[in-house]
Amino acid sequence: MNNNAFHFPVLLDAICKLIEDLPVKSDLIYIDSTLGEGVHAKAILEKYDFLSLVGIERDPQILERARQFLSIFEERITYFNDWFDNFFVNYPLNVKANFILVDLGISMFHYKGSKKGFSFLEDEPLDMRLCSSSCKISAAEIVNTYSKYDLEALIYDLSNEHYSRRISKAIVEYRKIKKIETTKELQSIISKVYPFSKVKINPATKTFQALRIYVNDELARLKRSLPFWVENLAKDGILAIITFHSIEDRIVKDFFRSLSCDLYAKISKKPIMPSFDEIKKNKPSRSAKLRVVKKL
């Protein structure tokens, strides 16, 4: 197996600063709720030998990549192959985490190496399921069976795509002739009805985002997990969440705002953003926002 990661750790310097500010630095528990290939975890474990990691990852394919990538830290890591919203259901009440990291961005491996149709850069089967055994429906099933009105609502609600009506109509018209099976087919359908003058990003970007979020139930999982994350922090423990689009960022922002100021404190009023230099080195980081809360 290739032991190189596809992904770059976003906002790593800011995350390390949070760990360095922890008042105690001995036998601490670090939970990575979205382990992915383990790029944040590797950088953190290399730098801080007082941390033990619990790594949570739903996709068994990418979890195996993480195991290989993090093999030198094997004695300090416990792996959990499931969705992060399931992890705390049986979590022991007397074991609290000192640092919880949540990176809500999709891994570059899923875009570039999984062959599951997360990206339109290659022609792949239109699937988008992080785990085929627990996700009930694929992206292909959605675009081939949902009504025009349901598609329009799904695309708009989960991506704020202003041309969701045009796109849903084009999808329904196309599938009358041929079943939509691949990423390039769907991208082509969308591109043909998108106003050329309005193109700042690839016309298919937001629709692909909406389908991925829906297929993997991402927003509901986030909402279910937020209370678990803060409740399972130790005193002075930190919850750090990286978001990549406005919908999930609003969910995190509103939840943090709802927390009792007697129990929790926001580290900064505004989200922490990547620097110009980081964006230059890692273009996908440009959308990242880091929000942080501390248990008092």
From Swiss-Prot:
Gene3D superfamilies: Putative methyltransferase TM0872, insert domain (1.10.150.170), Vaccinia Virus protein VP39 (3.40.50.150). S-adenosyl-L-methionine binds at residues 38-40, 57, 80, 103, 110. Pfam families: Methyltransf_5 (PF01795). It is an enzyme of class 2 (transferase). It catalyses: cytidine(1402) in 16S rRNA + S-adenosyl-L-methionine = N(4)-methylcytidine(1402) in 16S rRNA + S-adenosyl-L-homocysteine + H(+). One of its GO terms (molecular function) is rRNA (cytosine-N4-)-methyltransferase activity. Its main location: cytoplasm. InterPro entries: RsmH, SAM-dep_MeTrfase_MraW_recog, SAM-dependent_MTases_sf. It is found in: Cytoplasm. GO terms for cellular component: cytoplasm. Keywords: Cytoplasm, Methyltransferase, rRNA processing, S-adenosyl-L-methionine, Transferase. GO terms for biological process: rRNA base methylation. Disulfide bonds: none annotated. The keyword S-adenosyl-L-methionine applies. Belongs to the methyltransferase superfamily. RsmH family. HAMAP family: 16SrRNA_methyltr_H (MF_01007). Specifically methylates the N4 position of cytidine in position 1402 (C1402) of 16S rRNA. This is Ribosomal RNA small subunit methyltransferase H. It comes from Borreliella burgdorferi (strain ATCC 35210 / DSM 4680 / CIP 102532 / B31) (Borrelia burgdorferi).
